Amino acid sequence: MTALDTLERVETAEIEKPIMQDKQIARGVEKITKTVGVPLTENAKFGIRGVDVFYGEKQAVFNVDLDIAKNQVIAMIGPSGCGKSTFLRCLNRMNDTIDICRVSGSITLDGMDIYDKQLDVVPLRARVGMVFQKPNPFPKSIYENVAYGPKIHGLASRRSDLDEIVETSLKKAGLWNEVKDRLHAPGTGLSGGQQQRLCIARTIAVSPEVILMDEPCSALDPIATAKIEELIAELSENFTIAIVTHSMQQAARVSHRTAYFHMGRLVEVNDTEKVFTNPDHELTEAYITGRFG
């Protein structure tokens, strides 16, 4: 039985096990002494060790150890407020923009400490791009949306080079054929799904090594979502991708590995098929079978 078969069975059949009560969930959290499954891997692009995240005095993420493999898709799932988006933002230091946020522990990118005090975050964020929940094209033309990053980072010395980057990025984002005859039209005039693919093209244009996606399909219709999911599969051949999603079906469709977060703890990480068909932790099983959420 595949991961998607398991989720379809859960959706269509009556759950035999009772809904987990708050006290049961709390006891389950108390039992989390370490992440189960296979949190560490070979060929790691990111190495995360002992990461804690605080907002003021409130701790949001607890002691995460995780490797993110090169040229794979890892999906991060869990209930709302479980810390998955907070953790994702640690990977390109977007949490630096929040004054009360503090990150401790170690995060390395190809062995480089990304929290080194001497590190310039601008080139880091070029290497580790991000696509947000809501499409956010610049109030510029389609062409200028994609060209902006390469201009800022000095990646094109001639107009012809810039034209090539724009075309290549739009093709990789699966958008070129839809916009090639109107490149100077406003990016904000595109449909929601097209805007999100434009944002992906904008990210690709600066030649990142990693793409972070925070709920990239939550504001899109099913057809646009399907196009984004197809795109993720294609992009994973050349990029490392970490995606936060509330859709377990989406995680099952697009990812190689899945990480389950609960109340700031990384509960379980394993191959996606294993997580959805035979999870090792009772909290993971309870979540994917709909006993709480």
Curated annotation (Swiss-Prot):
Pfam families to which the protein is assigned, alphabetical: ABC_tran
Name by which UniProt lists this protein: Phosphate import ATP-binding protein PstB
Record's catalysed reaction(s): phosphate(out) + ATP + H2O = ADP + 2 phosphate(in) + H(+)
A GO cellular component entry from the record: plasma membrane
EC number in record: 7.3.2.1
Binding-site list for ATP: 78-85
Keywords: ATP-binding, Cell inner membrane, Cell membrane, Membrane, Nucleotide-binding, Phosphate transport, Translocase, Transport
Gene from which the chain derives: pstB
InterPro entries, per database record: AAA+_ATPase, ABC_transporter-like_ATP-bd, ABC_transporter-like_CS, P-loop_NTPase, PstB-like
Locations listed in the record: Cell inner membrane
CDD domains: ABC_PstB_phosphate_transporter
Record carries keyword Repressor: no
A single GO BP: phosphate ion transmembrane transport
Transmembrane segments: none
Annotated PANTHER family: ABC TRANSPORTER I FAMILY MEMBER 17 (PTHR43423:SF1)
Assembly notes: The complex is composed of two ATP-binding proteins (PstB), two transmembrane proteins (PstC and PstA) and a solute-binding protein (PstS).
Its biological purpose: Part of the ABC transporter complex PstSACB involved in phosphate import. Responsible for energy coupling to the transport system.
NCBIfam families noted in UniProt: 3a0107s01c2
Family membership noted in the UniProt record: Belongs to the ABC transporter superfamily. Phosphate importer (TC 3.A.1.7) family.
One MF annotation (Gene Ontology) recorded for this entry: ATPase-coupled phosphate ion transmembrane transporter activity
